[in-house]
Amino acid sequence: MSCMVCACGQQAADTGNPFLSEFETPYGTPDFDRIKVEHYEPAFLKGIEQQNGEIKAIVENPEEPSFENTIVALDNSGEILARVSGVFFALTEADTNDEMMALEAKIAPMLSEHSDNIFLNQELYKRVAAVHAQEEAGKIQLTTEQHYLLDKYYKEFVRSGAGLDAQKQERLREINKQLSTLTIEFGNHVLADNNDYLLVVDKKEDLAGLPDAVIAGAAQEAKAHGKDGKWVFTL
């Protein structure tokens, strides 16, 4: 009974999460009116689960590797993850807060591990390499766009360490995890510095040439920072 209740609760939560289906807005833009902070982590987890299943299906496909069943299938995978990542990281880079920053620190290593699980997947790499070899040998003819996509994925696997031995791959995973965390920390420090920066202008003549609306806005900003009679500009 308790398992059924949990399952129903999870289904209800999933149903209300705007990231788990296409945005029903003009041009498919993010539905910010419905998006809440608590939607992000479940969407990331669901997105990882979805893409893992899609990768598993590619790897276990009994048919010979082809452009369609390997490269196209790989490129089409991770729809939920792409949707939530696009919104989440756009906000954390421009309009973040302590709650989002804490969540980003939690999500980044998770995504690093997920990426490694894809691009260090030997069976998946073999299929991608097989399609690449088919084109190199002239056994398949691809359009310019198809060639670009194949070449992009093949190089990404190689550059991500798919050809390394198991020991070196494990070390690479550790480095990638550390980098993901350090990158987030560095970005947060830069953002904090930008948010703290104030350019204070004491003389109105120094603002000559600026539109009146900009000058008025700077005066309001100065008042908000307790600097009446001056003009403040932020980054």
Segments and roles (model prediction):
Residues 3-7:
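C-terminal motif of bacterial Sec signal peptides marking the signal peptidase cleavage site
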Residues 8-235:
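Zn2+-dependent metallopeptidase catalytic domains
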